[in-house]
Amino acid sequence: MMLYIVFILSVIFVIGFVGFSSKPSPIYGGLGLIVSGGVGCGIVLNFGGSFLGLMVFLIYLGGMMVVFGYTTAMATEQYPEIWLLNKAVLGAFITALLMEFFMVYYVLKDKEVEIVFEFNGLGDWVIYDTGDSGFFSEEAMGIAALYSYGTWLVIVTGWSLFIGVVVIMEITRGN
């Protein structure tokens, strides 16, 4: 049952990003991105990352809703265009969905999924418990590893978010 839930959430995740990439109006692009982010948090929660899923949901989606609410208010249209009105956008949306479904069928037709990534060199990330001496929370150790070993990742992520907000502000201010 859990496999089906993750599969359905993954399909909704991809459909949301296909909808985001073939948006006819900025309102629907933001909606597709927010839906995909929420479904992605659900996938993380399903795999046991309750803290990470909650933080992404609160911080990322909260920030996304503020940014997209502001940009939508700046670039609003009286009658926003939908997918059905523009035949080129509808064709791109349906083509992308068909390509995604054929890719899933091609991968799953043998009912075997091979390991795509091999995790070598996890010695720094493994939590060592000496038995009866105590309990280590995996989420707390993951956060500690993110800020100790992933310092540059946090810096690059913060800088990317800042540049994204600056670009969005420049685009909306130009109209």
UniProtKB/Swiss-Prot annotation:
GO-annotated biological processes: mitochondrial electron transport, NADH to ubiquinone; mitochondrial respiratory chain complex I assembly
Pfam hit, one: Oxidored_q3
Catalytic activity annotation: a ubiquinone + NADH + 5 H(+)(in) = a ubiquinol + NAD(+) + 4 H(+)(out)
Claim: Transmembrane helix is one of the keywords in the record: yes
GO-annotated molecular function: NADH dehydrogenase (ubiquinone) activity
Origin superkingdom: Eukaryota
Predominant location category: mitochondrion
Localization per record: Mitochondrion inner membrane
Enzyme class: translocase
Transmembrane segments: 1-21, 25-45, 47-67, 88-108, 149-169
Keywords on record: Electron transport, Membrane, Mitochondrion, Mitochondrion inner membrane, NAD, Respiratory chain, Translocase, Transmembrane, Transmembrane helix, Transport, Ubiquinone
Topology term for the membrane: Multi-pass membrane protein
Signal peptide location: none
Cross-referenced PANTHER family: NADH UBIQUINONE OXIDOREDUCTASE SUBUNIT ND6, NADH-UBIQUINONE OXIDOREDUCTASE CHAIN 6
Function: Core subunit of the mitochondrial membrane respiratory chain NADH dehydrogenase (Complex I) which catalyzes electron transfer from NADH through the respiratory chain, using ubiquinone as an electron acceptor. Essential for the catalytic activity and assembly of complex I.
Record protein name field: NADH-ubiquinone oxidoreductase chain 6
Lineage, highest ranks first: Eukaryota, Metazoa, Chordata, Craniata, Vertebrata
